Amino acid sequence: MTALCIGLMSGTSLDGIDGVLAAIEPSGAMRVLHHAAQPFEPGLRSNLLKLNHSGPDELHQAALAANALARAYAAIVAQLLRDSGQQAGDITAIGAHGQTVRHQPLLHDGTGYTLQLNNPALLAELSGIDVVADFRSRDLAAGGQGAPLVPAFHQGVFGRPDTTVAVLNVGGISNLSVLPPNGQVLGWDCGPGNALMDHWCQLHTGQPYDADGAWAASGEVQARLLNRLLQEDFLHTPPPKSTGRDLFNPQWLNDRLAGFEGAAPQDIQATLTAFTAQACATDAWQHAPEAKELIVCGGGALNRELMRQLQAGLPQTAVVSSEAHGLPPLQVEAAAFAWLAHKCVRRETASLPSVTGAQGARVLGAIYPR
């Protein structure tokens, strides 16, 4: 029987919330019926950015931010219901990822932790719909990275029986899925996505992102700085691996800008764009040289300069937006969490040990009944 599920995603780019209403078949095949998006209210975005780092009174602030997120999520759910003409009782579940503010797998005590701010109980109360949340912790408990979780979804949506396909999600952090026609699906975080570019753009232009990559295109890449950025150890660590703003944050960037204080801001932006492009293209070339197509999703797919550089770095591979495959780039991750929620309520495993390094496949998510 076809199930209607809602997926909600607010990623490490911190640009806002994307929501989709999707129809999902028992086989896992799905189609997106409606999409809604809402930027973060500036005060909430500012608080979430601060909570990516240790600070005073952070437990109190985190709890209030989780409540605010739940209310913002509920508003997106209400919009999707209005737009579709559906009632709350028609929806099987909401998959609400939450907002990642810490991601430190396999550290400290050997298990580590991942923390996504969310109040799924409040969201269930406000929406009248079962909510699935906390998708990553179960994989960590099984010895995995807890990320990325979307390669299984990518395989279902973009995989082909006759050729290897690579899928690159460029949100705040970038991650790559390698989908062979036969064999294990692979996936990992490449490193930076939009996070550093967006930070620099906001700092120097007051804009939340570099529209079309036009500002970066106006600058000149600083080769010495780019080489310094590319020396980051994470980039040279073999998969499975995952990262977040714990690593690629403004302090990380400031530490590496020492000696470049006189560089023009647009040149730094050009260099940060080249950094993301090279980190991603190198991973695709090294781990999926046979892929004829690199499908790009997330906000980075809308950055023309980034897409141009990815294509230049992968001349034998067609670099295309997920839009070319019927799924707009800003809808892909939200659709993935609708799909993961459906898996959870059916008690079906959704993690891939070949991706996260976990001891086995696990059912992901915790259910908060309406």
Question: Where are these predicted regions, by residue range?
Answer:
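Glycine-rich phosphate-binding/hydrolytic loop that grips phosphoryl groups
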Residues: 10, 14, 270, 274, ...
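Glycine-rich phosphate-binding loops at beta-strand->alpha-helix junctions
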Residues: 101, 291-313
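Short glycine-aspartate micro-motif
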Residues: 3-9, 21, 91-95, 165-169, ...
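Non-transmembrane, aqueous-exposed alpha-helical and coiled segments at domain scale
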Residues: 88, 264, 268, 280-287, ...
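Short beta-strand-loop/turn "lid" adjacent to the catalytic site in phosphate-handling enzymes
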Residues: 55-118
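Conserved ATP-utilizing enzyme core subdomain
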Residues: 4, 16-40, 186-277, 281, ...
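Phosphate-binding/catalytic loop of phosphoryl-transfer enzymes
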Residues: 4, 109-114, 121-125, 129-208, ...
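Phosphate/ATP-binding catalytic cores across multiple sugar-kinase/actin-like superfamilies
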Residues: 72-80, 265-290
